């Protein structure tokens, strides 16, 4: 049973106990941090909690205004010299609850990878810092059609990375699209920006900032353009692709957990699968472009003082010397990763 289903099952059992105050039950995971499911009967609040040494300092003031979430920290009466961190979902919507369960399950998986209680608490806090944007925007609705298409493109390139000889953890870490970085994939010496467009839009693509195609600070910057056709049947759906990636990563626990974390913060939740299964993507064309020389782009250094947040469109009818083979791109990335 995966962690989010286990959490939902425990919540259901706690709810059926009909206790008005907060009740808790330990989650059975191999972790140095004690983790619990909680339920507050009088308000119908589902939650998770953590018990840890009172010697670990934790400031919850940055989390007091989280949308949909209530965070409390107090002395743990069940364990000596311990604190109790309680995180409760105050939104009763079923979809939001399922998403919260997925987030909690991801935390349960993640804290198993560290060897000290302090490290585990820091991991929990790190996840909480990301919740404001997630709960205020991405949990309210499913991904837009354009967001689904963009994610499909990013994950298609990600699949190429993890099917190469690249270390899978490094591959997952290089996917920085969910972090709102200028490019979708970035490491110390290379970056790849992915643009996924439908056939009727080719050859024009939208560039979202003056930094997106600015290669000034990196050794190699590539633009990967995927042209897709949207079909009611045939082709591959976004959930299909994600299931393939999960299967590839299944033997690498840390990489798999990191991938799930990034999926969540990209706004993808399994509870919305039925919506995403309505769109099938058939890949019509793929091209890679090395961003250099006469490749059409705006660079930050060319802007007048005070100009920023530039969005513009380019045509990919570019000189042939900018087009490179996929094998060239992957081999370059692998050579850089091997030399770091």
Model-derived regions: residue spans:
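Nucleic-acid endonuclease domains
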Residues: 1-180, 197-340
